[in-house]
Swiss-Prot record:
Keywords: Endosome, Membrane, Transmembrane, Transmembrane helix, Transport. The chain crosses the membrane at residues 51-72, 76-98, 143-163, 164-184. It is a multi-pass membrane protein. One of its GO terms (biological process) is vesicle-mediated transport. It comes from the Eukaryota. It holds the Pfam family PRA1. The gene is PRA1A3. It comes from Arabidopsis thaliana (Mouse-ear cress). It is found in: Endosome membrane. Its main location: membrane. This is PRA1 family protein A3.
Amino acid sequence: MDWDSVAAEDVIEALREVEWSASPRSLAEFFSRFAFPRSFSKWMSRLKCNLYYYRTNYFILFVFVLGLALITRPLAILGAALTALSLAFLNDSFAATFNEKMIRTIRHFSPHLAAKMRPPHMPVIRGRSATRKTVYICGQPRLVFVLLGLTASFVLWFTSCGLLWVLYALTTALLMILLHASLRTPNLKARLNTFREEFRAVWRNYSEL
């Protein structure tokens, strides 16, 4: 895959739609080979490739650094967990899986309430939605849960007086991710994995027709 021709918006869209259930890459692979990029275009291409390929590792690193910085503040740790959950809701696969599990659990106690939490049906034309698909969680657009989670996180951080620590941890985690993604040389496995996921996406779209 030619990452030079991939825009940043396309990478964000791919991260939102791709499956995050895959296990993280091994530490041996994660810390295998490092080198400075030869040019700005090479750096941008490497950055986009690594952010996509090591997405699970970066998410774990992000949560770990955030939790480590707030280990002495239980409320702030809870806020960090809510932040991680809210960000995970932005991924289509995670949000849909969470929604199904919640509805399945609620159905055991109240089938009528579970039926109301089902997302509304979208008009379909030739196997595709007429409008851009909206992901629902418990009958509400996922943006509602994302905003509620982030608001609750901010309140917990402010209450625990850990807001500055949170900003410090966020900055540290993002810098570590940016540094690794900039210096880690993409290997053949990363390229082959990208081609495989591209094929799956094309086949999925073809099967929906």
